[in-house]
Amino acid sequence: MRREIAIILILIAIAIACCGCIRKPQEGGIATTKIKIGVMPDEATLPYYVAAQEGIFTNHGLNVEIIPFQSAMERDSALIAGEIDGGGNDPVSVALMRNAGYDLKIVSLGLQATPDKMRFAILASPASNISSVADLNGKKIAISRNTIIDYITDTLVGDTAVELKKVEVKKMPLRLQMLLNNEIDAATLPEPLASYALYKGAKLVISDSMLNRTISQTVIVFRADFLNNNSEAVNEFLAAYGEAVKRINANPEKYRALLVEKTHIPPEIASNYTIATYLQPQVYPETDFDTVIHWLQAKNLLHRTISYEDTVWRGE
């Protein structure tokens, strides 16, 4: 009898101890949720780092781990493998992954070009005589095929008679090096590499900020399985992101050092580099989605229907 009582007491003690292991709610009653976010070393990631370092994620009941990647391929592989839950991405990549059968959702628009701040540019080599889009006709341009870079290149050239000789150079540092060494006529580069190339003598042919419409946008994505099970946490994530955006836009210089550190902006241009104006979380526009899908269809890169309704999450 005593032994039975002792066993019961032990079981009660274990049960009480386990109760202490249950996730405790933060202030406001929000349970702590772990989210793994994958990021690239580009300026679109700054709000994530600000929200993490200034405790904004924590205040929203989130435990966010930011995982850096050096290539989009590595980031996307981690996303579809379930090693990360979401993060920054681009609409071309998202559409191609959905086409391959991976259920990802765009939960918000991210960063985009503005009239005073480019995100992508076509640049000519320092020794070239290229000064306009028309001058690109028949010239070799370094890109990465079937990516946002390829999409931006085609869109910047537009409906002209210009025929480009596209050269596959996936690694952006190599693309930059070939451009500056005059080994290629032109290249399409993202920021901050585009600004650095200009600093080193490359010539600006055209950038996305020179157009009268927005063509280059980042998006925030999550795996559908994570989103379905953690919709409240994703809403809190976007709210925290929005708070970080407010702080950055209110005092961008305060975050210059963090931006330089996380995006590897070359020291030669770090002090004068234009900091982007960040957007509040918002639904990714259907018109922009359709433009990307039409481009992918024209290149025969889609073998299934990729609909706006299935791809874009409107919140709950």
Cite the ranges covered by each PLM segment.
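Generic structural marker for isolated residues within well-ordered, non-membrane alpha-helices
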Residues: 12, 53, 153, 256, ...
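Short, solvent-exposed loop/beta-turn-alpha elements that line the ligand-binding surface or hinge
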Residues: 59, 113-115, 211, 279-286, ...
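Pocket-lining segment of extracytoplasmic ligand-binding domains
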Residues: 92, 166-258
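Hinge/cleft segment of the Venus flytrap/periplasmic-binding protein
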Residues: 304-316
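Soluble non-cytosolic domains of exported or imported proteins
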Residues: 42, 70-73, 88, 143, ...
